[in-house]
Each structure stands twice: as C-alpha cells, then as structure tokens.
Amino acid sequence: MRICIVLEGCYPYVTGGVSSWTHSLIRSFPQHEFVLWCIGADSADRGKYVYELPDNVVEVHEVFLNDALKGVPGHKRARFTPEQKQALSDFVHCTSPDWGVLFETMRQKGMTPIGFLMSETFLDLMTDICRQDYPYTAFSDMFHTLRSMLLPVLFLMCQQVPKADVYHTIAAGYSGVLACLGGYVNNAPVMLSEHGIYSREREEEIIRATWVLPAFKRLWVRFFFMLSRAVYGQASVVTSLFGNARKAQIELGCDPSKCRITPNGVNVEKFGAVPPKEPDGWVDIGAIVRIAPIEDVKTLLYAFAEVKHYVDNARLHVIGPEDDKEYAQECYELARQLDLHDVLFTGRVDTAQYLSKIDFTVLTSISEGQPLSVLESFAAGRPCVLTDVGCCRELLDGGEGDDLGCAGFCVEPMNRMALASALERMCADDGERRAMGEIGRKRACTYYRQEQMVTTYTDLYQEVVSSWQA
C-alpha cells in the first residue's frame, strides 16, 4: 500500500508530540510505502529535517506558503461558469463551498492564485461581502484581509499531487485541504487523524491575536471552520485521541459514523526499561516540551520560583528544543531575573535516557490533545503534574472502566500558585510519587501500548482502501 501522509508545520522539520507520533507510525509499517506531503511556512526550511527519514519513505513533496507570492499573475479576465462563481462566492464568504468545483477551477489552464485575486470576479465578490456584512469597514482592510486569508489555500489547490492509495492528513486545516485535493485528483480515499481540534485551536489563537483587526476576527474563525468541514466531509474515517475530542468533531459537523477514538501508543518496553532515579539529594522535575508560547514555560518558571522558597533541593530540567527562538530567549531572561540557578535547559536529548535523572514530570501547556510525553513518563514510572487541558485529567485519573487510581495532580492552566502547590506536594513525599508512578506505568501498559495503536491503524488503512475500491 502507498500511503500519503499530509503534514502541516511539524514532521520532519520540528520535534514534538505529533512529529514523534508520525515518525513512529511510519516505522511501524515497514511493509507499506509512505509519501510525505509537507506544508511549511518558509521555503528556507526546504530539506532541513530534524528526523532521519525511515527507509520506507519513498518520496517527500514540500510546499511552502511563502512561495505563493512568487507566482505569476495569470489571466485577470478569467471567465467563470455560474457553478464556479457560486463555489467561489461560498469560498470568499467562508461558508460551505463545493470543493470539487474549486479544485477544477483553480487547476484550469492559465489560472493562478494571484490571477484570481486580481480578477474582476474577485473584486465583485469582495464588494458584495463588504456591502452585506462590513458596510462601515475600510475597503482596503477587507482586501488585505481576504488576500492573506485565501491566498495560501488557493496556492495549495494548484499543487502537483503525488500518487497514493490513501491520503492521510494529520490536521484538519491546510493539510486537510491538500489531502482532499489528493483524493479528488486521484480518486482515492482520505483519512483524518486529529491530535487536537484544529478549528477550535485556531479560534482560541484568533481571539487572543493582536494582528487580526477586531472587525475580522469572526471571519477568520469562519475561515478555519470552513477548512475543517472540508476534510470532515470528504474523509472516510476521522479519528481523535479521546472521547471529548470526538464529541467536538461531531459538534463541528462531522458524521458520527466516521468518528473513531484511537488513543496514542507508547513503546512501553523502551520506556519501561528506564531505571528509578538514584537518590542524590535532589528532587528533579522534568518538563518535556518544545520551548514555545503554547507550552507556557513562563508560568512554569514563576511556579518553580515559588517552589524554591519551600523546597531548597528542587531542580527543574526543561527538556526539549527551541521551537520559538524569541520566546526561548524570553524564558532564559526570565530565569535570570528570578535568580533561578537550579533550572537546566537541556535542548534536544534522548528522552528515555534523560528520564533516568528525573523524579517526576510537569506539563504546563495551555492547549493539548493527548500528550505523548505524559505517556512516556507513565511508562517510565514517573508521575506527572499537568494542566487541565485536552485529555490530561483523563490520563491522570483514568477513563471509563479504569479504576487503577491517580497518577499525578491536575491544575488549571496559567495558574502559577496552583501549579506551585502541586509541585511542592509532589516534591514532599517520595513514597506518594513512587505509588503514583506505578499507577501511571500500569495505565500506559494497559491502555496505551504502541502495539494497540499499530493494530488499530492496520485495520483502518485496510478498511478505508477496501471500502473505497468496493
């Protein structure tokens, strides 16, 4: 089987939970060929992989969104059928366009993204939306907003499509559109595996964003919901990591019959071989993160400063690469300002090896799905302090039918005092830590084994391709 994995802003360029999952998935199916179709922001990243690609990756197709501005204008006076005009109108209004018609329209000879955005048809559509919904908004603001919003998607529609038996996208945004394009052009099935709810995550970002004019925030939110609906509609199977995520997909319009829960899987043999930490007089706390705003490392540093007032022998290890260099520099400066001498920023390391130095782990993310780093900690017998986002509380307390017990503490996000209190409590009692760590180990071994995930995806790939061919 030839499987095209469609990726957006992750593997193989950066590390992290989704990238680790993707790498593990590919390595788990040596009998299949994999094609990577990767969307990135900047063409300067072309070929700069942080992973050594497995031997069964036979092709890599890279698409960089900043290349969208390098295209030639094309025909400004392109003629459109009534059907095409309706699809383009629905697209510009961010409702429910006919994606097949859009794909055919943008791939016709002489059509380019810039050409459409400079056409009379686009001007007419933009004038309509201004009159209907934005009568008091500057026309120039609307033009630049729609241009920046629509250009990347129009650019993606014009890409050459690699051949595959199935197009498997790991997000419901730009990569979802690209997977739909692949399925449409080559008459092949589409699968979606969401690690977080893409449209909800973008909505949260837009609400907080300062770069989006207030008048256009609702339009931007509609835009990302439109992208999600596209792949929800075309995909044969839509997976999520836990029950509440599945409910969210259904609320957003996905057919419940398509929705499957496929939890992450961890190599319990590899991480189970991590020995208990040797007593050395320190209580070592590990934060396995990418240093980026979504991980909220700053709240962790503030909380650790509080911990040091009461637990002098506490030591914090921030384990992972700089995903956002500017934010990382701010974190280093904050650690200096707080006079935190017992904080180590390790950079990228072998997580399994490094966990032998750690008593317990902490994750302070403001948005998560089902963090793989937590499952790795559990498999290594390390309890966790987590923020109450995504599936984190369920991981700590157990889901339906799981009565193993509690594997750590859960606190609300961005609450430094609650986080500090939980860290202090975990530092205080070695016996409680070990008991919670053992519960975590049993939970990982029972419910989150990599072999279970591989079996699930073996069945899903076979089901999707067989059903499509039938």
Predicted features and spans:
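A short, well-ordered alpha-helix in the C-terminal region of glycosyltransferases
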Residues: G183, A407, A418, R425, ...
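Short hydrophobic beta-strand element within catalytic cores of glycosyltransferases
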Residues: P383-L386, G390-D397
